[in-house]
Amino acid sequence: MSVVNFYGQLSNTQQFDQIRINIASPDQVRSWSFGEVTKPETINYRTFKPEKDGLFCARIFGPVKDYECLCGKYKRMKNRGITCEKCGVEVTVSRVRRERMGHIELAAPVAHIWFLKSLPSRISTLLDMTMRDVEKILYFENYVVIDPGLSILQKGELLTEEELQKAKDKYGEDAFTASIGAEVIQQMLKELDFAKLKHELYEELQTTSSEVKKKKIVKRLKLVEDFLESENKPEWMIMDVLPVIPPEIRPLVMLDGGRFATSDLNELYRRVINRNNRLKKLIESKAPDIIVRNEKRMLQEAVDALFDNGRRGRAAKNANKRPFKSLSDMLKGKQGRFRQNLLGKRVDYSGRSVIVVGPELKLHQCGLPKKMALELFKPFIYSKLELYGIATTIKAAKRMVEAEKPEVWDVLEEVIREHPVLLNRAPTLHRLGIQAFEPLLIEGKAIQLHPLVCAAFNADFDGDQMAVHIPLSIEAQLEARVFMMSTNNILSPANGRPIIVPDKDIVLGLYYLTLAFDNEVGEGMMFSDLAEMEHALYNKFITIHTKIKYRRNQLNAEGKMVHVIIDTTYGRLMVGELLPSNPNIEFKFINKQLTKKDISLVIDLVYRHCGQKATVIFADQLMKLGFKYACSSGISFGMDDMVVPESKSTHINETQLEIKEFEQQYSNGLITYGEKYNKVVDAWSRCTDRVANDMMKEIATPRVSDEPNHQKINAIYMMAISGARGSFQQIKQLGGMRGLMTKSNGQIIQTPIISNFKEGLTEFECFNSANGMRKGQIDTALKTASSGYLTRKLVDVAQDCIITEKDCGTDKGIEVKSVIEGGEVIVPSSEKILGRTAAIDIFHPVTNALILNKGELINEAKLEQIESAGLDRIMIKSVLTCESTTGICSICYGRDLATGTLVSEGEAIGVIAAQSIGEPGTQLTMRTFHIGGAATKGAEVSSVEASYGAKVKIISRNVVINSEERKIVMSRNCELLLLDNNGNEKARHKIPYGARLLVDDGDMVVKTQKLAEWDPYTIPIITEKSGKVLFKDMVEGISIRDVTDEATGIPSKVIIESKQYSRGAELRPRIQLLDAEGAVITLSNGLEARYYLPVGAVLSVEDGVQISVGDIIARIPKESTTTKDITGGLPRVAELVEARRPKDHAVIAEVDGRVEFGKDYKSKRRIIIHPIDETMSIEYMVPKGKHVVVNEGDFVKKGDLLIDGNPVLQDILKVMGVEVLANYIVKEVQAVYRLQGVKIDDKHIEVIIRQMLQKVEITDSGGTTLLAGEKIDRHEFEEINKKAIKNGLKPAAAQLILQGITKASLQTRSFISAASFQETTRVLTEAAIAGKVDKLRGLKENVIVGRLVPAGTGYFMDKMRKAAVKLDEENI
C-alpha cells in the first residue's frame, strides 16, 4: 500500500494539483461536443419531450429519465450503454445532461467579444489597430486592405464602400485585395508570425525614445510573449464553432399553469441558431452581398449577446424589457457563480432561531430547543434507535421520531452528549462570529446563549437570530472542540486582550459590590474568616460596603501560604474568593472599586498566570456574582438622577459676554470672519466642558441621608463610571448642556444647544439638533456597506498569507518607538513590542547585561525588564522584513494573539489581519449616532505645558527677539524635548512657526509650566530683520482685493487668485524689506528679504511702513475646524490601504537642501531645492493657491513637507523607503481606530502592507528577458536575477512598488482567486491568453475547487500528502 493512500484516497474529482486555463481551439470544442444543435426548438409543447436536434435534444445530451430512451423502447438498468436505433438516445443516467455539451457550426466566423471589448482589447493590440477600427471591420462598416498589390494603398488601411469603389475604378478590380467582416480579421491574425514580430518589437523598443510609444510596444510585446508561451493561436479568438452548454445547466421548467420558465441562455442560443440557419440558407441561395453581410452582422451580435450581453451596443431584452442574463453575467458579481455558489454554499444540518439569554449556562454550553435538536440530529437518532433494537427499520425509526415517542428523547439526549454544535451570528465579521458549544436540550423555541460570549458575536437579545450547524465527521467534531469551543476563544485575535469580559449588568453588579462607604455600620471591625463575616452581615452588624479589616491567607512570591491583614469590604472579599490562588494574582487587583477596565485586567492576569481552565471558571463565577448583585442593588435610572448644575447659568452668561466681545472685535475689523467663527466655537466648547465638569462633580459626590436603604451614589453616575452603560458624553447631554451641533457637512453650528434633555429643548434647538442626528442615521446606513466592502477587499488581498515555516533566518527588522502626540506618550513602545521577537540581542544600557537574545519572543516578563532598563527604541522582527518565499515565518510574526504563544505553522494570519482591521470598521460606523450628532471637538491647542519636571532641549532652534523682547520661533521643524536626569526623552512637542518661546535650551522646568504659546487660528508670516515694507506685484483687483466685511464694513487687504486675468498669471505678490537707502535687505542665509504671500493671506501692514524684527506682516487664516469622527476615519483607512493619492496631497522634499522660489509657470509656483552636495537641483511645480510651509532660504531635510497635507504614499516609499512608509501607514491607520478607542495590533496592519508591497517594477532589464516597465512578483524577480547571475548575465534592476489592495488582489498569482474577487471577465480573458496555471496555494481557490483549505489542519494534511508522494516516488 502506498503512503498516499494511507492519508485517504483522493476521490476522482480531486486528482489534480493545478488548474490551467486556455483559449479553446475549434477542434477542442468539437471534441467536447456530442452532436450539433441545428434547430432552435427546445421541447414539444404537447408531449413535453425534447425536440430532435434542438437545444434539449436527448440524442445529443442524453436521456431525460434514468436508463430510459426517448421513445421508450429500452427501459431499466439492464439496457445501459445501448444506443436506441429508433430515437438514437443512449440508455444511461440522466445526470449526463449536466455534463454533455453540444456545438453549433457557424456559417461565418464570429469574434469572441471578450477578446475584442475587454480592455485592453487583445485583438486590436495584436493587429496594432485601434479598437474602433477593428469594430468597423467586424460589424461590416468598413473594408480593410489586406494586400495593396499594385495600388498605393497601405496594408491595414480602412475603406468605406464608396472609397473601395473609387479605388477599384482607379486601379482595377484585381490590383489589390480588400475584405470585410470577421473572416478578414481571422486571416490577419493567422498571418501573424509571432517569432518575427517579437524580434521586430524588441528592436523597435531599443530605438524609440518616446515614453508613450515604449509603453505601447511593451504592451504588445507582453501579449505576443503570452501567446508564444501558452501556445494559443491568435485566430482562435475568432470562432468558427460555438459550444453549447449542457441543458440541465440552462433548464426549462414547467410552472403550475402549464406555462414554462426558461433560462435566458436558451433564448440567447435560439437567436444564434435562428440567425445561423438563416445565414446558411442565404449563402446557399446566393443572396445579394448586402443581405448576407447584414445577416453576418446580426449573427455576430447574437453571439456577443450570448457571451456578454450589453457589453457592446444595446443589450438584448426580453418581453418585459429586462436584459437577458448572458454567460458572463452568470459568473459576475455577488449573484454570479463564483460568489453565490462556489464561495458561499447553503449547507444541510443547520437551523436558525431567535436567541435569548441563558445566565445559568456554563461558558461552553448553549441551550438548544428540543424540536430543533430532533430535526438536526435525525439521522443519528435513526441509527441509534435501530442499533438498540427499539426500531426494526429506518422507516419505523422515522415514524417513531415523527410521533415523538418518549424513547426518542432519551436517544436524543445520548446522541447530543458531547457532540458540539456551531453557533453563528450574521454578520460574521471575525472568526469569533462562529463558535462551538455543547448543546443542552431546553423547552421552548429559542436558542439560549451564554451572556459572556455576546461581545464576540456582537449579539444582543432584542430579536437577534443565530444559526446552528452540526459538525458531522469525527474530524469536524474534533476541530470544533479543539479550535472553536467558546472556552478556547478567550482572547481576541485582534489585540490579544480577553474578549470574554463581563459587560453591562454584570459590571454594574460588581461595581456596586466593591463600593466602600464611610460611616457604615460596623466600620473597622476585624474578621478572620468569611463564615464569621457572613454571620455578621445577616445579623446586620455590617453591610457589604462597610470598611473592615480581614486576615487573608495568600501565596507569597516563593509560593508559601502567609497571613496578611488587609483593609477591605465584605463585597470585595466575595470577589477575592473567586480568584485562583497564584502568587502573581494579588488581592490588591480587586481591592478597589471594580470598573470594566479593572475586571478585564484581572481576567487577563488570570489567563496569563493560571491558564485557560481557571479563567473560564473565574469568568463564569464572576458573571453569576455580578448578576446577583445587579439585581439586589436595586439600581435604577430615574429622572432625579440627572442633575443640572447650579453654576450652569453663570457659565452660559460668561460665555455669552465673551462672544459679544468677539463680535465687537470682528465689527472693528481686528479679526476675520473665520477667526471669529473659530473663537466662538472654542468658547462654547469650553463652556460645555465646564458645565459638564460641574455636573460630574455634583453627581460623583455621595449623597448623605438618614433614610434606611438610601442609595448613596447616583445611579446614572455608577452606570457610566463602571463602564456598564452610557458614557459621560451622554450624561453631559442629559444633565449639562447638549452643546454644539454639527451641520450635515460636518461644519459646526455656532449657536449651541443650551438646554439638556431633562429641561427639554426649544423648537429652535430641536430643529438644529435634528440636523446632526440625521447625519448619524444616514452615516450608519451608508458606512456599514462600505465597511463590509473594505473587509472583503482586505480578506481578498491577504487570504494566501499563511505561516509556512518556523524561521526564515533574516537579520532584518524594524525599529519601534513610542507614539507621542502633543508631548503625551499615547502608546508606549512596550505596548507595541509585546508578543514580537527581537531582531538583535538586546542589552541593558547601564549594566550591559543581556536581556533578550535575537529571535526571542518578548513576553510580559521580558517586557518588564525592558521597561525597567528604560529602553524606548527596540529593533523587532516584522512580517515586512520576513524573507520566506511563500507565506511568512513564525519568528517574524511573533505571538498568536488568540492564544498568547508563538504562532504555529499553518495559521491563516492574513485572514485574521483582514478581519481584525475590518471588524471594528463596521462597529465604528455605528458609533456616530449614539451621541446624536453633538459636536465632539476639543478646544484648539494654543500652548504647551510641561507634563514633567525636566530639562529642556530644543532641536533646530532658530529664534528672533521681537520688539516686545519675546523669543519668536522662526524654524519650521522646531521641536522641544523634555529630558529626565539620565537624558532619556520623556516628552516631545512640535513648536509651530511663529510661536512665542517661553523657555530656552538647557532650562529646567517644573510640571505644568508653560513652555510656548501661539495663535491657533492663523499661520503668521514673520520678518527676521527690521526695515521698510515694499509691496510688489500687488495689483488692486487682480492679485489683491480690499475685502469689506458685510457685517462690519471694515476693509482688509486679502491676496486673491489671479488666474482669470492674462496679466495676473505673471504676478507673484510679495513683500520686500528695504533698508534706509532703499535697497533690499539681505538675510542671514544670503538671500534677499522677500516674503511671498499665498492666496487668502490677510495683510497686517501697509505699504511703506517701518517694521521691526519678529513682526507679523501677514496672517493666513486656518480653515474652520470640523468634527472628527470615523466618518472621516473609514474612508481614510480605505484611502491608505488602497494607496490612493489624497485629495490635497502634500509635496515632500526628495533631498536635503536649501529652498528657492523659481519663476512661476502659468497657475503653478516653482519650488527649487538645491542639494548640499551641489548636484542637480530638483524642481517642484505646485498650484498657486496651496499653502507652502517653507520660506525661501529655509533648509529642508529629505522627507520634509513643502506643502501642507497628507503625503502621497508612493512618494514616501520612493524617498524614504519601506520602513518609513510602513511606520506612516501603521501610525495613520492606528490614529483612526484610536480615536474610537479600538485597539488593533500593529502586526495586522503590517501583514496588509506586506501584501501591498509584493510587486516590483523593472527599471532596467539587464541581460534578462524582462521588459522595462513590467511589473512582476518580488520573489519571481529575485529568482530570475539569480539565474541571470548564474549564467553570467547582467541582472535586471527594479524598484519596489506600492499597490492598493484592490489592484494587489487582482494581480495575485491565482487567477481563480482574482476572478472571484472583481472584474471577472477581464481576469479570465487575461489568464486564458497567457495560459495561466493556478497552483491552488491560497484559501479561496481551494474553497472554489472544493478542497480543504491549506491552512490550519488542512495545511498539515497537505504537508503530509506531499511528503507521502515524495516517499512513494523514492520507493518506486
From Swiss-Prot:
GO terms for biological process: DNA-templated transcription. Pfam families: RNA_pol_Rpb1_1, RNA_pol_Rpb1_2, RNA_pol_Rpb1_3, RNA_pol_Rpb1_4, RNA_pol_Rpb1_5. GO terms for cellular component: DNA-directed RNA polymerase complex. Its cofactor is Mg(2+); Zn(2+). Keywords: DNA-directed RNA polymerase, Magnesium, Metal-binding, Nucleotidyltransferase, Transcription, Transferase, Zinc. Mg(2+) binds at D460, D462, D464. Zn(2+) 1 binds at C69, C71, C84, C87. It is an enzyme of class 2 (transferase). Its EC number is 2.7.7.6. GO terms for molecular function: DNA binding; DNA-directed RNA polymerase activity; magnesium ion binding; zinc ion binding. It catalyses: RNA(n) + a ribonucleoside 5'-triphosphate = RNA(n+1) + diphosphate. Zn(2+) 2 binds at C808, C882, C889, C892. Belongs to the RNA polymerase beta' chain family. This is DNA-directed RNA polymerase subunit beta'. It comes from Rickettsia akari (strain Hartford). The gene is rpoC.
